[in-house]
């Protein structure tokens, strides 16, 4: 397990600007108490009820839960992704396009695009999700950050034809799939790798065994990839820290695990 304290830098200033804009936008119609309660409810759904299937869109059915996801959850996802960009040296990837599967608000792909190597400006974004609100929010994220991208309302199992210098990112989304579609996704990712794609799978560190993860890790490593567990100590904006504490949560240390597969011939 790798641990690193995160310091202020130019990339996090972009994070700070995005967070403030998003937080201000969503708290125009919500009080601090309402956002705190929504964050607790959403946390309960994602953390304590992962073993129970939920109807599509159930987690984001209310304005409060959408606000919590767009501000609190997305902020922590960005901060973890920024740590991975440093540790896995993802900024060295020469990318034309980042395809984010189950993109949510698009922050993880955006964090990567802002720092990835490109001769023609930041990598273009393609976000795939089954939630219309999430796709709309992803577009807002990208526009605010000066990124270009398009969204597709479909299952994350179905992604566009892969070309050279494409990256496929699945951040906190593979675990949400049923077993059948998840197996199909892995087959499609293997094909994408053979076509030259960079692949990154990011998930929370599980409190209990997750059978699919071990199987995926074995196959990714057989293809030359790596499996890692990470933790970092992020610098939290004050509103985020206050919401986190009031919700009875403690994200002073973020933890995640990854499967990372570079194109053949890349070291």
What are these model-derived regions, one by one?
Residues 2-55:
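N-terminal auxiliary segments of SAM/dcSAM-dependent transferases
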Residues 57-84:
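Class I SAM-dependent methyltransferase Rossmann-like catalytic core
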Residues 105-120:
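Conserved SAM-binding loop of SAM-dependent methyltransferases across substrates and taxa
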Residues 131:
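Conserved SAM/SAH-binding beta-strand->alpha-helix loop
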Residues 166-180:
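A short SAM/SAH-binding and catalytic strip from SAM-dependent methyltransferases
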Residues 183-195:
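A short glycine-rich, Lys/Arg-flanked "PGG" loop and its adjoining helix->strand segment in the class I
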Residues 195-204:
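Conserved beta-strand signature within the Rossmann-like core of class I S-adenosyl-L-methionine
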Residues 223-267:
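Class I S-adenosyl-L-methionine
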């Amino acid at each position: 397990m790798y641990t690193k304290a995160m310091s202020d830098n130019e990339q996090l200033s972009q994070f700070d600007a995005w967070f403030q804009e998003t937080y201000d936008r969503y708290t125009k119609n919500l009080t601090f108490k309402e956002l705190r309660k929504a964050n607790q409810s959403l946390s309960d759904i994602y953390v304590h009820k992962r073993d129970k299937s939920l109807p599509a869109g159930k987690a984001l059915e209310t304005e409060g839960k959408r606000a919590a996801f767009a501000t609190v959850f997305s902020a922590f996802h960005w901060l973890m992704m920024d740590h991975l960009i440093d540790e896995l040296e993802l900024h060295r990837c020469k990318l034309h396009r980042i395809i984010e599967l189950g993109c949510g608000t698009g922050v993880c792909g955006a964090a990567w695009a802002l720092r990835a190597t490109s001769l023609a400006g930041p990598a273009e974004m393609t976000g795939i999700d089954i939630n219309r609100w999430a796709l709309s929010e992803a577009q807002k994220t990208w526009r605010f950050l000066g990124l270009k991208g398009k969204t597709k309302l479909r299952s994350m199992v179905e992604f566009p034809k892969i070309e050279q210098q494409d990256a496929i990112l699945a951040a906190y989304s593979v675990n949400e799939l049923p077993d059948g579609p998840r197996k199909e996704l892995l087959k499609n990712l293997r094909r994408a790798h053979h076509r030259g794609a960079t692949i990154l799978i990011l998930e929370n560190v599980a409190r209990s065994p997750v059978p699919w993860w071990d199987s995926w890790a074995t196959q990714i490593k057989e293809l030359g990839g790596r499996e890692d567990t990470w933790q970092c100590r992020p610098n939290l904006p004050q509103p985020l820290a206050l919401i986190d504490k009031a919700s009875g949560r403690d994200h002073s240390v973020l933890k995640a695990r990854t499967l990372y597969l570079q194109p053949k011939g890349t070291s």
